[in-house]
Each structure stands twice: as C-alpha cells, then as structure tokens.
Amino acid sequence: MKSYQGLADKWIKGSGEEYLDINPADKDHVLAKIRLYTKDDVKEAINKAVAKFDEWSRTPAPKRGSILLKAGELMEQEAQEFALLMTLEEGKTLKDSMFEVTRSYNLLKFYGALAFKISGKTLPSADPNTRIFTVKEPLGVVALITPWNFPLSIPVWKLAPALAAGNTAVIKPATKTPLMVAKLVEVLSKAGLPEGVVNLVVGKGSEVGDTIVSDDNIAAVSFTGSTEVGKRIYKLVGNKNRMTRIQLELGGKNALYVDKSADLTLAAELAVRGGFGLTGQSCTATSRLIINKDVYTQFKQRLLERVKKWRVGPGTEDVDMGPVVDEGQFKKDLEYIEYGKNVGAKLIYGGNIIPGKGYFLEPTIFEGVTSDMRLFKEEIFGPVLSVTEAKDLDEAIRLVNAVDYGHTAGIVASDIKAINEFVSRVEAGVIKVNKPTVGLELQAPFGGFKNSGATTWKEMGEDALEFYLKEKTVYEGW
C-alpha cells in the first residue's frame, strides 16, 4: 500500500493529537499519520505570515506572477502523481482527479499571468494642477479555509490570486484531505516561493479554524464549506476588533429542470452526471430533478436506463463513481435514504450499501418527493437524487427557487422562450442550459445566491483577484 508519510512529515508540523489519513476506498489503507495543529501552532503560523508580509508585498508583482507560473508548470509535470494522491485521499475517480489537477495548474498559470497586469486607474480632476489616480495594494495576511471535495482546485483558486496580489496566507484544508495541500505547498516551494509566505495548518475547524478567523492579524477570510459553519465564521469575523473582509462559498441544493421541449436522452445523461458524478459530493451537484409532467414517464424510463450503466468502485479502477469520502458522510447519506423511505417518497433505484472495504453506496433515486420533505430542502452531499413533477414552467421555477440555497440551477430545453424565462427568474449564481449543474470554467466568476454565499465577492476569474486587493486613491497636486 502506498504511503505518503514523508510528504506529511515534511509539510505538516502540528504538535497535537494524531490523525489517520485513510483511503475511503480501502479503510485498511492508511496514507499517513498526521499530527494536528494546536491553537499555539496556529498562532505561530499566523506570526510567520505577519513577519513575511512586508517582504512579499514589496516583491514586484511580475516576480510573484513568475513563481505562480513556474508552480503551474511543475504541477503539470507531476500531474499523474497529484491525480493518484487525490484519488487515494478523497476517493474520486482517476479521470475526475486528473480533470481537477489540470484545472489547478491552469489556475496557477492564469493568476500568475494576471499578476503582470495588476493596476489602478487615472481619473480627470477639476483642478488643472491635480492628478488623480488609484493604486491596488495587498490586504495583509489572509486566512483560507478549504473543503475536502475539491482538495486541490479550491485551495489553488483561493491561494493563487491571494499570492498574486501580494498577500501572505494561512491555509487550513479539511482534515480529510490535508496531503493534497501539502503537495501544493511543496510545488510552490520548488517554484521559489519564500518560506513563511504560505503557512499550512491542519486541525479541527471548531478549534483551529475559529482561532484563525478570530485573530486580529487576519485581514481577510475566504471560506468554502457548509452554510452552518459559514454563518458562524461570519459572526466571528464581525466580532473582531479589526474590520475583516470575508468571502463565503457555502452549501447548495441544486435543481435540474427537464422541460417538455427537452432532448430526454440528453436530460437523463445530464441528470446522472450531475447527480452521481464525484459521488454527488459537490456544492454544484444536481440534488433535485424537476420534471415537466408531459414528459415525466418517458424521462423516468431514460433516467433508469442510464443509471443502470453507472459503475461504482475504487477510483483507481475503470469506474464512474468512487466511494463516499468517510464514515461520517456515509452514515449521513444512509440516514437520508432511510428518511426518504419513511416519509412516503418512492425509492426507484439504489439505496443499498455495496459490500467491500470502502464506503461504497449505490446511486440512489427517489420519486414523489414533495417540497416539504427534507430530501427536497436539505443539502445531502451524496449520491442521492430526488425527483419532483411540475405541471408547467411556472411551477417548475417556483420549485427550483423553493429552497434556501442558490448555487447552480439547470434547464434542459430546446424552447428558447422557456430557457430565457428560466434564466431570468431562477435565483442562482450559475445557470446551466443543456449542461450539467456541475462543472465550472476558471476564467468565469463563481458564487452563489441566498444561503449559498455572502454575494459580496466572487471566486475564480479576474473577480477573485479583486477580493485580495484594496484600492488607494491619490490626489497629486503641484
């Protein structure tokens, strides 16, 4: 069994309790034993970031960008190694892991290039002897708290713009996937990033995370995770002595609407890919299917035909879906399945544990799910799809919007009027037309509405860079 103990020992230097990083496809496979960070360890990491800020912020932006570009090249060269580690640590298929690694090294290159064009603007003055211009400057030390489901790309899409802008960082990945960020820090170091610019800490969010975001040395917090934790972080930041910028990317309960004008074969493909790809463990995953009554029966048949071909197993094999990430999430998924059975939803596919050494679960589909059921309203974060019938487009839009979340939403249709109506009325930060609800491009801004985000600062694209910069206005007279 492959061990990553050397990687852990080199980059994760906590002094707290021991944590076992386990392969979710094989519970007997320990990837590494990791020492979690204590509050004192976190304070030390923050102090290192503070001490390094002046040097790094004064490093010319093109030089900072060159380091990111180099890191992207190195990651590309080591892509296979990154992908294997991701599959072993998080559980996703090698194909999905390689896709994420590719996006990650392209993100490094994207923000490396953007560092060359950080600039302010010049404005006209009413006084002929005055020049007005603005200057963009880094914020200071930023705290980045990242989830386990995209254990490389989300850390990169936070860290790369933060570094390009000239900030130093304390980054806390999820305890389920710390090795991916350790590998990222290693690549940045090889690319020439000075020690202390990025400081990795690993530990429980209730202790380590709270310590980071509450520290008055932290100028900004970027968090991706559950809405519950996001709201708590929002309050912690608000109670600090220092005003702190905050960026939140939170939970989702995304719907795909199948219109009566839809290509039903395409719709079934998008539903299965969006609902069961990545084991349903994505904030943009399809969790709800809203089906126009005129095509309900035909679509259901296509859906069941497609899901029967969906292959589940270890991500290192030729499969479509890997294991659930760990025992806690596995139990949560099973609890929702039992709930669905008990409240009157009809289980039409799956719902069973797949025997083996990992946390394997069949893709699961319920129909007859009503808007008052928890299956309809709550984020599950697993391979569980709920199906609800809508009498027309108006009711479908009402159902899509009838949750507290607004990350992504999709429509499958050929009727342009229906498409435009859906796009204009649905409350979500990303709308997909004849595309799966999952899948984002790095050059486009991303962020959810309602309880899926703070709707203040977007991630990815050029927008993300602005979160990590402040603007100074200068009036220069003579």
Curated annotation (Swiss-Prot):
<feature type="binding site">
    <location>
        <begin position="225"/>
        <end position="226"/>
    </location>
    <ligand>
        <name>NADP(+)</name>
    </ligand>
</feature>
<dbReference type="InterPro" id="IPR029510">
    <property type="entry name" value="Ald_DH_CS_GLU"/>
</dbReference>
<feature type="binding site">
    <location>
        <begin position="148"/>
        <end position="149"/>
    </location>
    <ligand>
        <name>NADP(+)</name>
    </ligand>
</feature>
<keyword id="KW-0054">Arabinose catabolism</keyword>
<feature type="active site" description="Proton acceptor">
    <location>
        <position position="249"/>
    </location>
</feature>
<dbReference type="InterPro" id="IPR015590">
    <property type="entry name" value="Aldehyde_DH_dom"/>
</dbReference>
<comment type="similarity">
    <text>Belongs to the aldehyde dehydrogenase family.</text>
</comment>
<protein>
    <recommendedName>
        <fullName>2,5-dioxopentanoate dehydrogenase</fullName>
        <ecNumber>1.2.1.26</ecNumber>
    </recommendedName>
</protein>
<dbReference type="InterPro" id="IPR016160">
    <property type="entry name" value="Ald_DH_CS_CYS"/>
</dbReference>
<feature type="binding site">
    <location>
        <begin position="172"/>
        <end position="175"/>
    </location>
    <ligand>
        <name>NADP(+)</name>
    </ligand>
</feature>
<keyword id="KW-0521">NADP</keyword>
<dbReference type="GO" id="GO:0019568">
    <property type="term" value="P:arabinose catabolic process"/>
</dbReference>
<feature type="binding site">
    <location>
        <position position="379"/>
    </location>
    <ligand>
        <name>NADP(+)</name>
    </ligand>
</feature>
<dbReference type="InterPro" id="IPR016161">
    <property type="entry name" value="Ald_DH/histidinol_DH"/>
</dbReference>
<keyword id="KW-0560">Oxidoreductase</keyword>
<dbReference type="Pfam" id="PF00171">
    <property type="entry name" value="Aldedh"/>
</dbReference>
<dbReference type="InterPro" id="IPR016162">
    <property type="entry name" value="Ald_DH_N"/>
</dbReference>
<comment type="subunit">
    <text>Homotetramer.</text>
</comment>
<dbReference type="GO" id="GO:0047533">
    <property type="term" value="F:2,5-dioxovalerate dehydrogenase (NADP+) activity"/>
</dbReference>
<comment type="function">
    <text>2,5-dioxopentanoate dehydrogenase involved in the degradation of pentoses such as D-arabinose or D-xylose, a major component of hemicelluloses such as xylan. Catalyzes the fifth reaction in the pentose utilization pathway through dehydratation of 2,5-dioxopentanoate into 2-oxoglutarate. Also shows dehydrogenase activity toward glycolaldehyde and DL-glyceraldehyde.</text>
</comment>
<keyword id="KW-0119">Carbohydrate metabolism</keyword>
<feature type="active site" description="Nucleophile">
    <location>
        <position position="283"/>
    </location>
</feature>
<dbReference type="InterPro" id="IPR016163">
    <property type="entry name" value="Ald_DH_C"/>
</dbReference>
